[in-house]
């Protein structure tokens, strides 16, 4: 428990488990992601919002991976939507920031706290976000188109065990994604045959994509959760959560599809 907040983790795709947690734990806030990181699972936002409302909980969703272009959680009934400005909204990997949008009755309470504690973004960073937002749609459309091509190509590669992308029919949430999202996004996850060592070899052989843990910029970024976002987890915990050995997360940038495909091909050929 930190700051008096007791957190309980529940698989939000299990709606019965969510409702039980809302009832039994007297939950005040339901917090989820539109598209989860790094497994790219899709949350059924209308159902989750309805459950939160039924039990008097505030519903909050991090919709960074979807962006406002692909999904508007407010229309699905959520109270608050969080976006990382650092990622796709800014799109140039040169600032840190976040934003919260939502229903007036909830935002008014946040605004009161903001007046007391102050904001954290300086004017220059705010101007950089405004710059990035001007090209958000064209950047997102281009990178999403390339991501879909890459996902389909990777799925047929002999060195790849599994590809996770909402736009593939093999994705567990393929049908749900069409209900929640207007497209499949620019994030692609996949599993390299041979485990983490082979995955690391592939990353070290990449020339076009850069190894980094951020996402949503004009440049393609690639990383392995076992060594970055989930490095503090045990291997057993990662595998239990679905992050298999050899798991790779790829943020698609604005590079040409053929350049990225050829880069992956030569890197995978080295294995």
Which residues make up each language-model segment?
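PLP-dependent enzyme catalytic core of the Aspartate aminotransferase-like
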Residues: 1-8, 19-22, 204, 220-271
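Conserved PLP-enzyme active-site core in the AAT-like
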Residues: 1-159, 164, 175
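Structural beta-strand/beta-sheet cores of well-ordered domains, especially the beta-sheet scaffolds
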Residues: 57, 96-97, 161, 186-188, ...
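Glycine-rich beta-alpha junction loops
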Residues: 65-67, 87, 135, 150, ...
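Short, flexible turn/loop "capping" segments at secondary-structure junctions
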Residues: 91, 123-125, 179-183, 240-244
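Short, acidic Gly/Pro/Ser/Thr-rich loop/turn segments
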Residues: 107-108, 136, 195-198, 229, ...
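Short, well-ordered beta-strand elements within core beta-sheets of diverse protein domains
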Residues: 129-138, 186-193, 249-253
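Conserved small-domain helix->loop->beta segment predominantly found in fold-type I
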Residues: 148-207, 211-216, 234-239
């Amino acid at each position: 428990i930190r700051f008096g907040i007791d957190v309980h983790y529940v698989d939000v795709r299990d709606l019965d488990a969510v409702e039980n947690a809302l009832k039994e734990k007297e939950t005040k806030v339901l917090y989820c992601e539109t598209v989860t990181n790094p497994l790219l699972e899709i949350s059924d936002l209308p159902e989750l919002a309805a459950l939160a409302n039924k039990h008097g909980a505030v519903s909050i969703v991090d919709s960074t991976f979807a962006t406002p272009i692909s999904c508007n959680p407010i229309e699905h009934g959520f109270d608050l939507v969080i976006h990382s400005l650092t990622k796709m909204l800014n799109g140039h990997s040169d600032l840190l920031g976040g934003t919260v949008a939502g229903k007036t009755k909830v935002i008014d309470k946040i605004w009161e706290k903001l007046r007391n504690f102050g904001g954290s973004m300086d004017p220059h960073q705010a101007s950089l976000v405004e710059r990035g937002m001007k090209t958000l749609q064209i950047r997102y459309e281009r990178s999403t188109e390339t991501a879909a091509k890459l996902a389909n190509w990777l799925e047929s590669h002999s060195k790849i065990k599994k590809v996770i992308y909402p736009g593939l029919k093999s994705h567990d949430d393929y049908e749900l994604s069409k209900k929640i999202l207007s497209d499949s996004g620019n994030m692609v996850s996949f599993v390299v045959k041979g485990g983490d060592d082979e995955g690391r070899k592939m990353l070290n052989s990449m020339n076009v994509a850069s190894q980094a843990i951020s996402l949503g910029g004009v440049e393609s970024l690639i990383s392995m959760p076992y060594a970055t976002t989930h490095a503090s987890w045990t291997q057993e915990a990662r595998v239990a959560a679905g992050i298999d050995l050899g798991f790779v997360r790829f943020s698609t940038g604005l590079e040409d599809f053929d350049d990225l495909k050829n880069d992956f091909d030569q890197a995978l050929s080295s294995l």
